[in-house]
Amino acid sequence: AELEANFLSLQNEMIRSGITTFESKSGYGLSVKDEARSLAIAAKHTSETTFLGAHVVPEDYADKTDEYVALVTGEMLETCAPHAKWVDVFCDVGAFDVDQSRVILQAGIAKGLKPRIHANQLAAGGGVQLAVELDCASADHCTHLSASDIEALAGSNTVATLLPGAEFSTRANYPDAKKLFAAGVTVALATDCNPGSSYTTSMSFCIAVAIRDMGFSPEQAIWSATMGGAKALRRTDVGALSVGMSADLSILSAPSFRHLGYRPGVDQISQVLKSGKTIYKHQDGN
């Protein structure tokens, strides 16, 4: 009950910040029971659930990473797959290497899950190339990219999902979005809301940081936070206002969308609609 209450509290924060579609990952249980429990709760509230049993290597498996990979791809996957749409892995230094990550993602694919990946957050490595190899919907973070990484992303269907809240919270260097846009990479922006490295549900904050520190124009930031996010989930029903798409939108109490970057930290969400129905309306004085 406590876990679900916390989930709903964060969901309400997201709605108030203008978010209508979100992905929820596991990865903080790291046991069969706790990973399955967290996904089962998330699946009650969003269709975009991601099995991330391979988030980090638990202390009990510190010198036995391959044993943990076997658990993740065996009993844990079997138990969690019914509650998940996606499979994810943290492919980076101190977590899982490229070969281990490939095994984990391929096991998920074999169970009918769609792949995505945490890649190149802490250091350059082979995560982005693996994402392209396996046609991952998204490579999250993409902080440390080589020219060949950018070229590979540009020629693929994999979205580079940038997470400014993580760099802000950890005082890390920001990725250079200008290089990605110049190469024709599809870019998404997301909050990366998690208690370890980016405990924010504010999309407007992430947009402001992306504009200030990552080289986004206001137009690029808005597109990446909407259509880019939809493409990172391979959704065609959300992300824009167009005939045949869901009427999901946020109405701002501002003269221009540019104020999302111009006035960081200011609540400018007046109303939020999902499928044409109001799910949040700002009340003055509340």
Go through the PLM ranges and name each one:
Residues 20-21, 48-50, 85-88, 137-138, ...:
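Structural motif
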Residues 15, 80-81, 109, 132, ...:
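Non-catalytic positions within long, well-ordered alpha-helices that form the structural scaffold/packing
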Residues 18, 25, 87, 118, ...:
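Divalent metal-coordination and catalytic microenvironments
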Residues 1-13, 20-125:
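Metal-coordinating catalytic core of metallo-dependent amide/deamination hydrolases
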Residues 268-285:
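Short peripheral tails and domain-boundary helices/loops at the edges of structured domains
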Residues 249-252, 281:
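A generic structural signal for residues embedded in beta-strands
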Residues 11, 73, 207, 226-229, ...:
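Alpha-helical structural signal
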Residues 114, 124-240, 254-258, 264, ...:
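Active-site-adjacent C-terminal substructures of enzyme catalytic domains
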